[in-house]
């Protein structure tokens, strides 16, 4: 593998940082914020003969040095103007944090202004779905539930709280979708932080990219990406919440930040998730005559417990750093396993454990009068995963234990303990080469190693040497460059980008090979290029049209190359997946109404799929190609003053094409399995002020979700549901091969106390107690009740 471009890029970043370090900073800097600490973008700052606008994060800097005694004036639409006097004679650098207060008679105007940040993200040339986490933070909802209401998005879960989650974006799922936290690949947190466990209170918003992914995320995603943006509030804050629900569910969230003198700060984010997940499911059990009969049973070995804490400290607004932040995260996950991938038979003693420690450092600095921005992140994580399957005997669905002679409930007993070491480096540079032109560069280097032991696991043939005891390494690097330009008075925005992907992996292929030398490592590597373009044309101040295309790649993952030393065999011949993505969309929005229509086309070649080879083993192979297209529509309308109606619908046609294996040629043209092709959402929410007393509020809401039946196996096209888009007819397949139509309704309310520090919420999930399925027809919980209390302090006195 060639590292020349990687080394050159890092060397260039380092030299540029040192070259510009001594640049003069004799100017005024600051940040314009609201009362609750949220930034105010595009505020006007006037001082001396200069006029500047605040950025999206509320920050600003004077364009040249300021001398003497000067008056500074700040104004923004919907806010009371602010004026102050500064004495710069004895100051080289001044940092101001200025709070603007909303005008009392412009509540509606302030409300619209508060959405500007989210709106600006929605209007980028590369389309993304933006979820405002603050708008739903007080509700007893998980992040997965909120994301499930977005157009083109389906969240598949293998059960209840904390269980496996898979995001499907326009039909593409699994490893084709990648996850980030504040622009950093989420892999650095080793499974301790994700959409299946993070409290929505700790997020500012969520960005979901469909197909085309911007350079600043730096991933090798094919189907899209999810970026979790955490609270970036630098004020002194504290917030906590506690949620209790059915199935002995308890969710605790806590976060706070304190500021100190000389721009030092420190904070903590923590949460605890626990649930018995002992809801009832419909299964088949064996009667006294050894015949299968339907039964409804309560899950008895499905509990989940998760602890996560991240503490951080740093300094900001210094001549040598805009922000330097050190953090350390600790987590532990304990999970019981109730059944294998399918609900075929129960387990009663298998346990999974995952724990880790993750220190990291992040450095941000602007140079050369804000013409160059540097964002550097480095982390090292040490995690351990443990699987215990040692019981001698079996359990039935009622929890009754029958002793046996063989070890383990599953086909592969285990006492595995595997250590993972991971290093991630992310370097991002932005060059403002002209008022309407920017160049962005992003480089990610991800290296991890795996080594462990399993007294009950596989051995090298003819030896007693544990396969897990031999170290496996994996490294990938991704370099992206983009040129963003504005034309015709910003009516036309264009983003042209190029990416380079490379990986190298080293390990031992010991699968069913009597001649394997346990000291002979095999190395594999590959590299490829991707490129694309995104363009947006602003028709008027209410509407725009945008389009994007991308040719991209996804590199094989370590577990796909090396297997899991269990039932998944290694395959060192895997090649990167390659995909062509295209999007076209139109958006129209006013203060009270918004509508967006989007279409997409995807074609993926050499898709990496898990394929059976010889029982009980399977192996990842470059087998199939997938072609998909579809559309979605997203609507919202504010009715009168207190109500808002939202709705969206998605139809997609994702099919298998170019099947190369003659044995599987019959699946040519069939739908991608386990993937819904139509789903829709409708929501209604209200906001009533001064209901029981002055300054209180009650916010009721209702959400309805519909999913059309979809197939668990490949179905011939003539057996699929007929009618318009397959929405009105019935399929001609066995009911065990499909997931039926599903309807989900959730109803709840949120009450905000007059002080605005306390709020209380309640929600009934699955109000109609419908049968719901997900992830290969794994049954989801029925009707459940949830209550949540929130406490928030906007400012803590030092």
Residue ranges and their predicted role:
Residues 139, 144-185:
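Extracytoplasmic beta-strand/coil segments of soluble accessory domains associated
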Residues 356, 418, 472-474, 520-530, ...:
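Outer-membrane beta-barrel signature, preferentially recognizing the C-terminal barrel domain
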Residues 60-63, 184-210:
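Short acidic/polar hinge/loop motifs at secondary-structure boundaries
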Residues 303, 314, 582, 638, ...:
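Conserved C-terminal beta-signal and adjacent last beta-strands/turns
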Residues 96-98, 200-239:
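A beta-strand signature from Gram-negative outer-membrane beta-barrel systems
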Residues 33-38, 44, 75-79, 89-137:
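Short, acidic, small-residue-rich periplasmic hinge/interaction motif at the N-terminus
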Residues 312-333, 354-515, 520-550, 589, ...:
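Face-selective signature of the C-terminal outer-membrane beta-barrel domain
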Residues 488-491, 501-503, 509, 601-603, ...:
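Gram-negative outer-membrane beta-barrel transporters
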């Amino acid at each position: 593998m060639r590292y020349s471009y990687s080394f050159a890029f890092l060397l260039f970043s380092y030299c540029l940082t040192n070259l510009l370090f001594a640049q003069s900073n004799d100017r005024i800097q600051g940040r314009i914020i609201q009362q609750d600490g949220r930034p105010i973008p595009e505020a006007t700052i006037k001082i001396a003969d200069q006029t500047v606008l605040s950025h999206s994060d509320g920050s600003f800097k004077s364009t040249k040095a300021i001398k003497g005694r000067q008056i500074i004036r700040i104004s923004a639409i919907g806010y009371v103007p602010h004026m102050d006097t500064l004495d710069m004679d004895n100051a080289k650098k001044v940092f101001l944090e200025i709070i603007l207060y909303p005008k009392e008679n412009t509540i509606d105007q302030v409300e619209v202004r508060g959405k500007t940040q989210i709106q600006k993200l929605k209007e980028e040339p590369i389309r993304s779905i933006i979820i405002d986490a603050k708008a739903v933070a007080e509700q007893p909802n998980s992040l997965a539930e909120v994301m499930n209401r977005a157009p083109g998005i389906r969240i598949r879960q293998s059960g209840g709280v904390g269980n496996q989650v898979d995001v499907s974006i326009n039909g593409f799922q699994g490893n084709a979708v990648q996850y980030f936290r504040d622009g950093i690949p989420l892999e650095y947190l080793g499974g301790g932080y994700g959409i299946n466990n993070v409290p929505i209170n700790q997020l500012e918003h969520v960005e979901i990219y469909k197909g085309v992914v911007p350079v600043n995320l730096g991933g090798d995603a094919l189907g899209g990406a999810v970026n979790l943006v955490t609270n970036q509030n630098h004020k002194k804050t504290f917030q906590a919440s506690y949620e209790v629900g059915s199935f002995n569910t308890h969710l605790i969230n806590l976060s706070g930040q304190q500021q100190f003198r000389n721009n030092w700060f420190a904070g903590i984010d923590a949460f605890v998730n626990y649930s018995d997940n002992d809801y009832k499911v419909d299964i088949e059990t064996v009667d006294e005559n050894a015949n299968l009969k339907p039964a409804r049973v309560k899950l008895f070995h499905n509990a989940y417990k998760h602890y996560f804490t991240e503490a951080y400290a740093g300094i900001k607004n210094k001549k040598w750093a805009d922000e330097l932040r050190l953090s350390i995260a600790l987590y532990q996950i304990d999970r019981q396993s109730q059944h294998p991938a399918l609900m075929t038979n129960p387990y009663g003693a298998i346990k999974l454990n995952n724990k880790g420690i993750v220190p990291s450092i992040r450095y941000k600095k602007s140079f050369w009068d804000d013409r160059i921005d540097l964002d550097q992140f480095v982390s090292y994580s040490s995690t351990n995963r443990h699987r215990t399957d040692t019981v001698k005997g079996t359990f039935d669905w009622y929890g009754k234990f029958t002793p046996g002679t063989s070890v383990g409930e599953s086909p592969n007993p285990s006492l595995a303990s595997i250590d993972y070491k991971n290093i991630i480096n992310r370097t991002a540079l932005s060059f403002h080469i002209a008022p309407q032109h920017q160049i962005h560069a992003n480089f990610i280097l991800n290296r991890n190693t795996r080594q462990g032991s399993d007294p009950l696991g596989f051995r090298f043939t003819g030896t007693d040497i544990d396969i897990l005891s031999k170290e496996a390494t994996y490294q990938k690097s991704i370099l992206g460059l983009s040129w963003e330009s504005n034309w015709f008075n910003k009516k036309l925005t264009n983003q042209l980008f190029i990416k380079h992907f490379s990986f190298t992996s080293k390990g031992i292929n010991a699968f069913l090979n009597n001649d394997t030398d346990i000291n002979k490592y095999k190395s594999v590597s590959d590299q490829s290029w991707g490129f694309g373009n995104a363009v947006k044309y602003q028709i008027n101040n209410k509407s725009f049209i945008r389009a994007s295309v991308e040719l991209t790649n996804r590199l094989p993952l370590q577990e796909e190359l090396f297997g899991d030393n269990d039932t998944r065999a290694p395959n060192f011949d895997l090649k990167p997946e390659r995909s062509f993505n295209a999007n076209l969309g139109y958006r129209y929005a006013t203060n009270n109404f918004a509508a967006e229509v989007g279409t997409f086309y995807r074609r993926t070649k050499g898709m990496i799929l898990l394929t059976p080879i010889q029982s009980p083993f399977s192996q990842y192979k470059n087998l199939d190609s997938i072609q998909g297209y579809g559309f979605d529509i997203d609507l919202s309308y504010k009715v009168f003053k207190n109500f808002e109606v939202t709705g969206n619908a998605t139809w997609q046609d994702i099919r298998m094409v170019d099947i190369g294996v003659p044995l599987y040629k019959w699946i040519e043209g069939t739908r991608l399995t386990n993937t819904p092709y139509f789903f829709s959402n409708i929501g209604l929410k209200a906001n009533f002020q001064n209901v029981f007393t002055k300054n209180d509020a009650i916010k009721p809401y209702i959400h309805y979700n519909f999913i059309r039946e979809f197939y668990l196996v490949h179905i011939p096209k003539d057996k699929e549901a007929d009618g318009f888009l397959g929405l009105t007819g019935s399929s001609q397949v066995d009911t065990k091969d499909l997931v039926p139509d599903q309807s989900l309704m959730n109803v709840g309310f949120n009450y905000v106390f007059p002080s605005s520090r306390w709020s209380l919420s309640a929600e009934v999930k699955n109000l109609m107690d419908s049968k719901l399925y997900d992830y290969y027809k794994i049954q989801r919980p029925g009707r459940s009740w949830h209550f949540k209390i929130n406490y928030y302090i906007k400012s803590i006195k030092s």
